[in-house]
Amino acid sequence: MEKLAELGINIPSFIAQVVNFGLLLGLLYLFAYKPILAKLDERSARIKESMERTDQVKEQAQRAEEEFKKKIGEASQQGQLVIERAVKTGDEIRQKAIEEARAEAEAMLSRARTEIRQERDEVVDQLRKEFAELTILAAGKVIDQSLDKKAHQALIDSVLENSTNLRKN
């Protein structure tokens, strides 16, 4: 102990300091260390909970994004179907308009042909009548007598019919 005294260490003072240090450690343990550890544990739990919530939010965001992409894909497909239907309907309407125009043109051509045929027949009949009258007049002048118009007309019609039949063949 003397050696400790030579070094300047006072034993009663040293013991008092060790006791004081032990008491201080005990008090700090009770009043500071436990509350600090409790606060740290609480903070750790909050951080862990926040991390879990963050993971959940990320998962929800990912699911929402996938659902959004899926809905966009479905909307795109529906849009394509609508476009295809519209194109098909447009083609059908165009085709129908073409067919109606074609039918109308054919009907107009048919009417025009019928009218032309009727007018031609009328002109031919009129020419026959005029030709017959001219023939009667000419024949009457040539023989200086007037023939029976009905008999002469029948003769001219017969000649004209024969000439028309010859032209058709």
Curated annotation (Swiss-Prot):
Short name of any one Pfam family annotated for the protein: ATP-synt_B
Keyword set, alphabetical order: ATP synthesis, Cell membrane, CF(0), Hydrogen ion transport, Ion transport, Membrane, Transmembrane, Transmembrane helix, Transport
Stretches of the chain forming a coiled coil according to its record: none
Database matches in InterPro entries: ATP_synth_B-like_membr_sf, ATP_synth_b/b'su_bac/chlpt, ATP_synth_F0_bsu_bac, ATP_synthase_B_chain
Membrane topology: Single-pass membrane protein
GO molecular function, one term: proton-transporting ATP synthase activity, rotational mechanism
A single GO cellular-component term on record: plasma membrane
Keyword Ion transport belongs to the record: yes
Localisation: Cell membrane
Listed transmembrane segments: 11-31
Its biological purpose: F(1)F(0) ATP synthase produces ATP from ADP in the presence of a proton or sodium gradient. F-type ATPases consist of two structural domains, F(1) containing the extramembraneous catalytic core and F(0) containing the membrane proton channel, linked together by a central stalk and a peripheral stalk. During catalysis, ATP synthesis in the catalytic domain of F(1) is coupled via a rotary mechanism of the central stalk subunits to proton translocation.
NCBIfam families: ATP_synt_b
Family that this chain belongs to: Belongs to the ATPase B chain family.
Assembly and oligomerization: F-type ATPases have 2 components, F(1) - the catalytic core - and F(0) - the membrane proton channel. F(1) has five subunits: alpha(3), beta(3), gamma(1), delta(1), epsilon(1). F(0) has three main subunits: a(1), b(2) and c(10-14). The alpha and beta chains form an alternating ring which encloses part of the gamma chain. F(1) is attached to F(0) by a central stalk formed by the gamma and epsilon chains, while a peripheral stalk is formed by the delta and b chains.
PANTHER family: ATP SYNTHASE SUBUNIT B, ATP SYNTHASE SUBUNIT B', CHLOROPLASTIC
Name used for this protein in its record: ATP synthase subunit b
The organism of origin for this protein: Dehalococcoides mccartyi (strain ATCC BAA-2266 / KCTC 15142 / 195)
